[in-house]
């Protein structure tokens, strides 16, 4: 993979892009020119913020076994080149958000970038274990941006649905951090699993993960319907099952299984919202 593609964190941003599309389709949008504009804007803005994260965290990435081979610590890209690249992508994405999508969707594009690149990456990540709760609003923003593009406004159902992404984020990130808690301790990054006893961390993360799954099921019962319910139930069941398994076993392997199940659950939920839009 090209180092410049790696800077975009494609394995991370694809789910955010899907969330923006789900918001648009659920809000009443269709397969049209606005959808393709949304895809371009979402790719540029989320990719730009991810690249900025690479630039800002290059020092701690060099200290962690999970990240030391990233383009900046490994010397494949210079810091100045990465910064210029990230800012160019970000500025283009945010500008096009306002120009192509409109004021309200563009505002959500800007807010999504600010919450991840500034609030999470610059301000909170190295200071407090609550960092993820500030950065998590970036997930709300991508869904709401797509929804606002379709509806022209934002309502309570959209806000509640956007919190599915917000509540999914802490347990997903912390389950990954649990596996690499030694890295975070070494780098001095205050992720929760690196700060508390392992058994306590497992209990907290698995409980939050199960709660997020239950919230997603409740959301779909309230605002969804149709054939999509089956796939939501499948994702929720797998997530709750792996959460219980992790809570009982209290092993790194069990936590990893829980981590691997959480992204498919959110993906299935977002797909189900789009299916529901067409009353399938």
From Swiss-Prot:
It comes from the Archaea. The lineage of its organism: Archaea, Thermoproteota, Thermoprotei, Thermoproteales, Thermoproteaceae. The keyword Cell cycle does not apply. It is found in: Cell membrane. The keyword Cell membrane applies. The chain crosses the membrane at residues 12-32, 35-55, 76-96, 98-118, 129-149, 158-178, 199-221, 226-248, 255-275. One of its GO terms (biological process) is heme O biosynthetic process. It catalyses: heme b + (2E,6E)-farnesyl diphosphate + H2O = Fe(II)-heme o + diphosphate. InterPro entries: Protohaem_IX_farnesylTrfase (IPR006369), UbiA_prenyltransferase (IPR000537), UbiA_prenylTrfase_CS (IPR030470), UbiA_sf (IPR044878). Pathway: Porphyrin-containing compound metabolism; heme O biosynthesis; heme O from protoheme: step 1/1. Keywords: Cell membrane, Heme biosynthesis, Membrane, Transferase, Transmembrane, Transmembrane helix. One of its GO terms (molecular function) is protoheme IX farnesyltransferase activity. This is Protoheme IX farnesyltransferase 2. HAMAP family: CyoE_CtaB (MF_00154). It is a multi-pass membrane protein. Converts heme B (protoheme IX) to heme O by substitution of the vinyl group on carbon 2 of heme B porphyrin ring with a hydroxyethyl farnesyl side group. Its EC number is 2.5.1.141. Disulfide bonds: none annotated. Its main location: membrane.
């Amino acid at each position: 993979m090209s180092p410049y593609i790696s800077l975009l964190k494609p394995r991370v941003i694809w789910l955010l892009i899907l969330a923006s599309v789900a918001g648009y389709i659920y809000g009443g949008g269709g397969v049209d020119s606005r959808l393709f504009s949304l895809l371009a804007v979402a790719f540029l803005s989320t990719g730009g913020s991810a690249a900025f994260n690479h630039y800002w965290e290059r020092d701690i990435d060099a200290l962690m076994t999970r990240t030391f081979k990233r383009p900046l610590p490994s010397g494949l890209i210079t810091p100045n080149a990465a910064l210029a690249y990230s800012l160019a992508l970000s500025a283009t994405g945010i500008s096009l958000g306002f120009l192509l999508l409109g004021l309200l969707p563009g505002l959500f594009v800007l807010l999504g970038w600010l919450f991840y690149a500034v609030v999470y990456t610059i301000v909170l990540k190295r200071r407090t274990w609550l960092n993820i709760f500030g950065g998590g609003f970036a997930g709300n923003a991508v869904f709401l941006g797509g929804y606002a593009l379709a509806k022209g406004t934002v309502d309570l159902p959209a806000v509640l649905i956007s919190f599915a992404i917000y509540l999914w984020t802490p347990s997903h990130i912390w389950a990954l951090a649990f596996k690499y808690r030694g890295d975070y301790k070494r780098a001095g990054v205050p992720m929760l699993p690196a700060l508390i006893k392992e058994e306590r961390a497992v209990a907290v993360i698995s409980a939050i993960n199960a709660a997020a799954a239950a919230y997603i099921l409740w959301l779909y019962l309230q605002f969804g319907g149709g054939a999509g319910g089956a796939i939501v139930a499948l994702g929720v069941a797998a997530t709750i099952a792996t959460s219980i398994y992790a809570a009982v076993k209290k092993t790194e392997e069990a936590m990893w299984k829980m981590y691997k199940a959480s992204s498919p659950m959110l993906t299935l939920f977002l797909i189900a919202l789009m299916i529901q839009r067409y009353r399938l």
